[in-house]
UniProtKB/Swiss-Prot annotation:
Presence of keyword RNA-binding: no
Keywords in alphabetical order: Ribonucleoprotein, Ribosomal protein
Sample GO molecular function, one term: structural constituent of ribosome
GO cellular component term, pick one: cytosolic large ribosomal subunit
Protein name, as recorded: Large ribosomal subunit protein bL19
Source organism of this protein record: Synechococcus elongatus (strain ATCC 33912 / PCC 7942 / FACHB-805)
């Protein structure tokens, strides 16, 4: 057994199998586990996926949303234990792999057209 196979077998234990297929431009709701005091709760974070990177256990998405007039971006490792759930709310129609140009846009210009040919 080579080193790559050993790494894959260890990673297979930690990968989540219930994740939906996420594309750039999709609007998603990510449930993030937060520890406050001795309690744990799940906080939803909703926004547009502007970047998708990595593969396997290192797969991550960058989600952007506008909060109180300020753009906020968070990077989520999809297979992390801190990510409780990922739900696709709507599919977006875009022609780019990275939507970094949305950072320079304000108001209604940041909207992404909806895509109807992919199921949610």
């Amino acid at each position: 057994m080579g080193a790559q196979e050993i790494i894959r077998s260890i990673e297979a234990e930690y990968t989540k199998s219930d994740l939906p297929t996420i594309y750039v431009g999709d609007t998603v709701k990510v449930g993030v586990r937060i520890q406050e005091g001795g309690k744990e709760r799940v906080q939803p974070y909703e926004g547009v996926v502007i970047a998708n990177s990595g593969g396997g256990i290192n797969e991550s998405i960058t989600v952007r949303r506008i909060f109180q007039g300020v753009g906020v971006e968070r990077v989520f490792l999809l297979h992390s234990p801190a990510v409780a759930s990922v739900q696709v709310l709507r599919r977006g129609r875009v022609r780019r792999a990275k939507l970094y140009y949305l950072r320079d846009r304000v108001g209604k210009a940041t909207r992404v057209k909806q895509r109807f040919d992919r199921s949610i």
